[in-house]
Design a protein with these regions (language model features):
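Phosphate-binding beta-alpha-beta segment of Rossmann-like dinucleotide-binding domains, i.e.
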Residues: 83-134, 146-154
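Short, Asp-centered acidic motifs that coordinate Mg2+ and/or phosphate
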Residues: 34-35, 56, 191, 219, ...
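Rossmann-like dinucleotide/phosphate-binding beta-alpha-beta segment
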Residues: 123-216
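An N-terminal-biased, well-structured beta-alpha scaffold segment characteristic
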Residues: 1-80, 184, 207
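Short glycine-/small-residue-rich Rossmann-like dinucleotide-binding loops
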Residues: 41, 62, 190, 196-198, ...
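Beta-strand-loop-alpha-helix segment that lines the small-molecule cofactor/substrate pocket
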Residues: 52-55, 67-79, 194, 198-240
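Alpha-helix C-terminal capping/helix-to-coil transition sites in glycosyltransferase folds
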Residues: 31-32, 53, 187-188, 213-216, ...
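Rossmann-like dinucleotide-binding domain for NAD(H)/NADP(H)
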Residues: 208, 217-308
Length: 308
């Protein structure tokens, strides 16, 4: 059995894969490939057709937006993912970003480093406490719920949620108040977190006049996927101070830089290069799980988390 490993995974997971499969790091002989394990590598219908023996695609992580799921389904190629392996690491990053932009941590560091702070506790570094604020969740999946748990237990936040796939009763059972629209949720929130997959329905979910509903002191975090928050509209909203600040760990063009987004021009924005799952523990869990599940499929068994 031959597995195409498109990107780096945890060394222990690779060793486990190499113990039972032939692992290739190149696409020189696609007709010999039985499985693909990927992180962000794009797999479309053309790739699938070149891999005539392809049986399974394993996603190292959660989001499958780089895989043509309809094409895989039409060709009888199974797709699986690891939906809970990185929950804690991404949730922790979300909490970190919220604290950072609420208290101007990165901004204070940069200004101090550059000699632009002339006295201690300067007024322009005045931030916002997270404790007791209202956290609005756009999407209430595993990651969002874990972030909410940390913030609720640690900071006493009140949690409200928007999720068209979750009933009012189910959301109340989570301890969240449900809102029926994104705009209503934003208007009721001091902190807005985006944790939904990128789909045609969620593309530009937060864009245009939606930014008019933000509280002036609110902060926004997107550690999900680029394209859910419209970056051009976010830039203008931040520049016009329609909200306090924003932080993104996901961008339309990745890795992000000042060359491909003007958001980095702003002092009330911080951006990280999709590092949500980049914790040793999460990488170990994701690697172990995706390897284990792909091997199961190649041995004729059903995976625990099948996407198609």
């Amino acid at each position: 059995m031959t597995v195409f490993l498109s990107e780096h995974i945890h060394p222990d997971a690779r060793k486990a894969l190499e113990a039972v499969c032939t692992v290739v790091d190149n696409f020189d002989h696609p007709d010999e490939i039985d499985a693909i394990i990927l992180r962000t590598f794009p797999v479309d219908a053309t790739i699938m057709d070149r891999c005539k023996n392809l049986k399974v695609i394993g996603k190292h992580g959660v989001g499958c937006n780089t895989i043509d799921l309809e094409a895989a389904k039409a060709r009888g190629i199974m797709v699986l993912n690891t939906p809970r392996a990185n929950t804690n690491s991404v949730a922790e990053l979300i909490v970190g970003l919220i604290l950072d932009i609420s208290r101007n941590i990165t901004l204070a560091h940069e200004k101090s480093r550059d000699g632009k702070i002339l006295k201690v506790a300067p007024a322009e570094m005045t931030g916002m406490e997270v404790s007791g604020k209202t956290l609005g969740l756009v999407g209430t999946g595993n990651i969002a719920r874990r972030a909410a748990e940390i913030l609720k237990n640690g900071f006493g936040v009140n949690v409200v949620g928007y999720d068209p796939f979750v009933t009012k009763e189910s959301m109340e059972a989570m301890g969240f108040q449900k809102y029926d629209t994104v705009k209503e949720l934003i208007a009721a929130s001091d902190i807005v977190n985006v944790s939904v997959p990128l789909t045609p329905a969620t593309k530009d979910l937060i864009s245009g006049d939606t930014f008019d509903y933000f509280r002036k002191n609110a902060v926004l975090v997107n550690a999900a996927r680029g394209g859910i928050v419209n970056e051009t509209d976010l830039y203008h909203a931040l520049k016009e101070e329609k909200l306090r600040a924003a932080a993104c760990d996901a961008f339309v063009t990745e890795p992000p830089s000042a060359a491909n987004t003007n958001l980095y021009e702003l002092e009330n924005f911080i951006g990280t290069p999709h590092i949500g799952a980049c914790a040793e523990e999460a990488l170990c869990r994701m690697g172990d799980e995706v390897v284990h599940e792909v091997i199961r499929v190649l041995n004729g068994e059903e995976p625990a988390h099948r996407v198609v």
